[in-house]
């Protein structure tokens, strides 16, 4: 009986050690900096592989998760570049699984192309397609239920910022868009704060402004989904992120990465941004 008892204890200890190891690895993966390249409607298919390979090669080994979100037409061409540090993302998705939705792309289609992330709620789509805001909740649910990950975008206009109500506005966006999400999955949701007034304008929120909003978003997550889920969720910044300002943004506690637009069309500058987040999160 004594031998059996010792064996059981040893097995139990080994199991606990493995669980703790897995938990530590999972926790590190969830909080690993993430820098996403949103190519928007740029780069021809004939040019995509060369630029994507440059981005991959210049960011390999940094310990930063890179997500490349090219136009739909490039996804199949770039699927061979995927690795543990380099993922494919889509810039949008339809909320339905299939059906008579001309031009629609479903989660299942993206998953079949080895896509891992989907951007939803980007300010450019919110502005160009006003009805988009009423579909975001359904898209988030479709993405998570389909086994993919969400990069959710939120942010305020200049008018709202100048009125001093930016915190309340972003909180209302979060509440409305995540109203159907009952169980938070921090490893599957990335929140990108992108002030609308900084998108494509050359303007950038100051590190203090960005940091304050990131803290407010995390506090909202804590109040709705709990402390551990909030702390494990990566909150990133988007809004004219460039090589010249990335280091200042990366130095702010609570900013876990960046959603990069125009600067992602230049592999050297994008690499500079990724390196900034590597240095400040080691």
Predicted feature residues:
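Active-site loop-to-helix "anion-binding N-cap" substructures in soluble metabolic enzymes
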Residues: 23-282
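Methionine residue identity
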Residues: 1-2
């Amino acid at each position: 009986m004594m031998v059996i008892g010792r064996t059981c204890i040893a097995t139990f200890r080994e199991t606990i050690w493995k669980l703790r190891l897995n938990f530590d690895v999972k926790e590190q993966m969830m909080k690993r900096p993430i820098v996403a390249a949103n190519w928007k409607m740029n780069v021809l298919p004939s040019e995509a592989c060369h630029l994507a390979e440059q981005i991959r090669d210049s960011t390999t080994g940094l310990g930063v998760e890179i997500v490349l979100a090219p136009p739909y037409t490039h996804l199949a061409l770039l699927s061979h570049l995927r690795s543990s540090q380099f993922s494919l993302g889509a810039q949008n998705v339809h909320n339905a699984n299939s059906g008579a939705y001309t031009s629609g792309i479903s989660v299942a289609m993206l998953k079949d192309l080895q896509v891992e992330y989907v951007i939803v709620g980007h300010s450019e789509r919110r502005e160009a397609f006003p009805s988009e805001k009423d579909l975001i909740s359904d898209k988030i649910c479709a993405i998570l239920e389909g086994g993919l990950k969400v990069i959710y975008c939120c942010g305020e206009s200049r008018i709202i910022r100048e009125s001093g109500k930016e915190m309340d506005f972003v909180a209302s966006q979060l509440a409305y868009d995540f109203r159907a999400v009952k169980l938070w999955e921090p490893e599957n949701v990335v929140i990108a704060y992108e002030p609308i007034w900084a998108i494509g304008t050359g303007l950038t929120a100051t590190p203090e402004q960005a940091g304050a909003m990131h803290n407010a978003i995390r506090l909202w997550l804590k109040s709705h989904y709990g402390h551990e889920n909030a702390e494990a969720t990566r909150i990133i910044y988007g809004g004219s992120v460039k090589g010249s300002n990335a280091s200042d943004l990366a130095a702010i506690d609570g900013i876990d990465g960046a959603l990069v637009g125009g600067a992602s069309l230049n592999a050297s500058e994008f690499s500079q941004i990724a390196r900034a987040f590597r240095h400040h999160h080691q």
